[in-house]
Regions:
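Extended Lys/Arg-rich, glycine-bearing segments that form polyanion-binding/interaction patches
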Residues: 34-37, 108, 113, 119-231, ...
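Short acidic-glycine loop/turn motifs at beta-strand connectors
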Residues: 50-60, 93-98, 105, 162, ...
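Conserved phosphate/anionic-ligand binding catalytic regions in large, soluble enzymes, centered on
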Residues: 74-90, 320
Length: 372
């Protein structure tokens, strides 16, 4: 097996060597949890990483691991007054041969960098981001679920304005933190098809913040998702705010479609968050499965007309969750793949990406970051 490791801006490809018994013993001393039945919820772990930005210094400090999971701040902190916060989500997991790894953390670092710029926050260098992830996972190795359980160690890096702000303006000082928590699948049914609805709410405005990972985007979706769950739907599909004719994404995942010609179709919009999972699945489709990929605007009417045989959601949390049925204001649109099992193309995409992540298939250069 070969794994590509990013070191700073370099990428190097080398064989993963078997661990000796001492190394394996360290990794196998796991916490006593029911790994196969974990929910998608917060569990406090041992260490978290913290770094601070002071305007007077003009740079981020070196950062460090700490034990304390509490944050003390002013009642007038920028994040509390004007929601000046951005975040990321990624996972650490155990490969088939016992190594602990993360998946493409440099891309999460770049996305956090871009998100920070959009909200007038000092961006954290990507190299420091990757190092912070490495430190947190290594310090919490006992919390990384064993291979084959379906669980992972979810990592939540986030940044926010911490200094007092009373007028509408950016904060001066900022706090960056990464915590880790073991989680089960985002959707409890795993790869079982889900039932979603078309919502009348908007997720993002044209030329707004839909293409960054800002907390405010998710706050706006909370009412819609609570309402959807009460009505028996797993998620909301948001349409473009300008014309309300094109599908964009859900509150927590990007959308993938397979048309009648077996092309993978990716909705195109400046309001869609650039998903790292989606980007990876596009590569898998083209280079592993030989699929043609079309990135273009996708109209809701196309789905109603039966132009797509499979539809699914993808993201760090969901990986791929197939959609079996879509409710459009009381009218059900049933996909050809149905509600019983994942469709063949979504299944191939999902199992191939999981095979790459878990070390069963050779990964493209730079995709796998080895912790230990």
């Amino acid at each position: 097996m070969f794994i590509s490791v990013r070191i700073g801006r370099r990428e190097t490809k080398h064989p993963v060597l078997p661990m000796d018994e001492g190394e394996r013993q360290i990794i196998m001393e796991k916490k006593n949890l029911d790994w196969s039945n974990l929910g998608f919820a917060y569990v406090k772990t041992d260490k978290r990483y913290v770094a601070n930005y002071k305007a007077e210094d003009g740079k981020w400090d070196a950062g460090a691991l700490i034990d304390d999971d509490k944050i003390v701040m002013s009642e007038d902190a920028g994040v509390l007054q004007y929601s000046q916060s951005v975040f990321e989500g990624l996972k650490a997991y155990t490969t088939k041969d016992g190594h602990i790894v993360t998946f493409r953390p440099d891309l999460n670092g770049q996305r956090l960098y871009d998100s920070a710029l959009r909200l007038e926050m000092p961006p954290l260098p990507v190299d420091q981001f990757v190092d912070s992830i490495h430190q947190v996972v290594k310090a919490n190795a006992a919390w990384v679920p064993p291979f084959g359980t379906g669980a992972t160690l979810y990592l939540r890096p986030y940044m926010f304005g911490i200094s007092p702000v009373i007028g509408v303006k950016p904060a001066d000082d900022y706090h960056y933190r990464v915590f880790a928590t073991p989680v089960g699948p985002y959707f409890k049914g795993g790869a079982k098809p889900i039932y979603v609805r078309i919502t009348d709410y908007d997720r993002a405005a044209p030329h707004g913040t839909g293409n960054i990972k800002a907390g405010l985007n998710y706050a706006m979706s909370l009412h819609a998702i609570v309402e959807a769950h009460k009505e028996g739907f797993a998620e909301n599909i948001y349409l473009d705010a300008a014309t309300r004719t094109k599908i964009e994404e859900t509150g927590g995942a990007n959308i993938l479609l397979v048309d009648q010609d077996d092309h993978l179709v990716i909705p195109k919009s400046n309001s869609i968050l650039p998903s790292i999972t989606r980007r990876s699945l596009v590569y898998v489709a083209e280079h592993y499965l030989g699929m043609k990929v079309d990135e273009r605007p996708v109209y809701l009417q196309e789905i109603k007309d039966g132009n797509f045989k499979e539809v699914g959601l993808c993201g760090t949390a969901a990986v791929i969750s197939p959609i079996g049925k879509i409710n459009d204001h009381g009218t059900d649109i049933e996909l050809a793949s149905g509600m019983e099992e994942i469709g063949p193309w979504m299944n191939k995409l999902r199992t191939t990406l999981l095979g790459i992540q878990e070390g069963e298939l050779e990964a493209p250069e730079g995709w796998i970051h080895v912790i230990e």
